[in-house]
């Protein structure tokens, strides 16, 4: 069994939980996912099955799209709605929407983030959330991410001393939308957190086409495996090249191939089928992953 699944992960489960349940449903252990989603987040979780597990790193490289809500007025330990309140800055007067949009625009392009303490990033061999649960705070490594698009998608609404609005973000892998929400609040002079989030697109797959675990289980019971999409979907933004019969034979035997390209990696096709991921070595390409 090989292929890629567009899974709709529902709230209340980790990405690992989803993989564990799919292994039982599909009766195979060779399953991985293409990008972690926090337990409270609903949305597209790309799943790789069989040979497709070798495509996970390329699936993760593609940009992701999120829709969510930011609340100004208080921040939390986890930077989302599930954490305990750590700071409050009441919103006592209406915000200037133009200034809000300017602050949002200032957070587009390449930016630096510090991962939240409640995250799976490892420091000295331990995950940050393990330190956080033990009441310890450690120095967290900065990371460079890219925000391709960040826009407000609703008017600002007010409730008591809080302000809320929805947003849409297209970003690179490794981006923490929780942290982006907190950073925006800081630019506006308010404690803030991400109060809701949905991932609407990842690895070229859209939420409107995604299936829940329950829907997949129903199809498997009917021996309908049409939800398994081809490996070719997982190449992400890699440039496609058509290989000759002779080059395919070289790939089969692990030999270098002469190709003219400035790309560091290429997706080698034979007809409509992906046969290899090629890696540049000086003026030639070496088969890095082979699917023959």
From Swiss-Prot:
Query: What keywords are assigned to this protein?
Result: Isomerase, tRNA processing
InterPro entries named in the record: PsdUridine_synth_cat_dom_sf (IPR020103), PsdUridine_synth_N (IPR002501), tRNA_psdUridine_synth_TruB (IPR014780), TruB_C (IPR032819)
GO molecular function terms attached to this record? RNA binding; tRNA pseudouridine(55) synthase activity
Which EC class heads this enzyme's classification? isomerase
| Pfam families per record | TruB_C_2, TruB_N
Domain of life from the UniProt record = Bacteria
Catalyzed reaction equations? uridine(55) in tRNA = pseudouridine(55) in tRNA
What does it do? Responsible for synthesis of pseudouridine from uracil-55 in the psi GC loop of transfer RNAs.
Family statement:
Belongs to the pseudouridine synthase TruB family. Type 1 subfamily.
- What name does this protein carry? tRNA pseudouridine synthase B
Q: Say which species the protein is native to.
A: Streptococcus gordonii (strain Challis / ATCC 35105 / BCRC 15272 / CH1 / DL1 / V288)
Quote the gene name from the UniProt entry: truB
């Amino acid at each position: 069994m090989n292929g890629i699944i567009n899974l709709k992960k529902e709230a209340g489960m980790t990405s690992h939980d989803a993989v564990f349940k799919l292994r039982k449903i599909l009766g195979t252990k060779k399953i991985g996912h293409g990008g972690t989603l926090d337990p409270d987040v609903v949305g597209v979780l790309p799943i790789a099955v069989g040979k497709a597990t070798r495509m996970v790193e390329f699936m993760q490289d593609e940009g992701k799209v999120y829709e969510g809500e930011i609340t100004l007025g208080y921040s939390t330990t986890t930077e989302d709605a599930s954490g305990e309140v750590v700071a409050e800055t009441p919103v006592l007067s209406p915000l200037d929407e133009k200034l809000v949009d300017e602050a949002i625009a200032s957070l587009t392009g390449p930016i630096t983030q510090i991962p939240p303490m409640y995250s799976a990033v490892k420091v000295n061999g331990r995950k940050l959330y393990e330190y956080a649960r033990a009441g310890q705070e450690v120095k967290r490594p900065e990371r460079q991410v890219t925000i391709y698009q960040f826009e407000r998608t609703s008017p600002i609404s007010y409730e008591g001393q809080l302000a809320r609005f929805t947003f849409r973000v297209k970003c690179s892998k490794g981006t923490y939308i929780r942290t982006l929400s907190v950073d925006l609040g800081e630019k506006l002079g308010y404690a803030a957190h991400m109060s809701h989030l949905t991932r609407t697109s990842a690895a070229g797959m859209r939420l409107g086409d995604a299936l829940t675990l329950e829907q997949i289980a129903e199809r498997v019971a009917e021996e309908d495996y049409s939800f398994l999409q081809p490996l070719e979907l997982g190449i992400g933004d890699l440039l496609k090249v058509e290989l000759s019969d002779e080059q395919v034979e070289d790939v089969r035997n692990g030999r270098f191939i002469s190709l003219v390209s400035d790309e560091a990696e290429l997706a080698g096709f034979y007809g409509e089928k992906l046969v290899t991921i090629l890696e540049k070595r000086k003026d030639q390409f070496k088969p890095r992953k082979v699917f023959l």
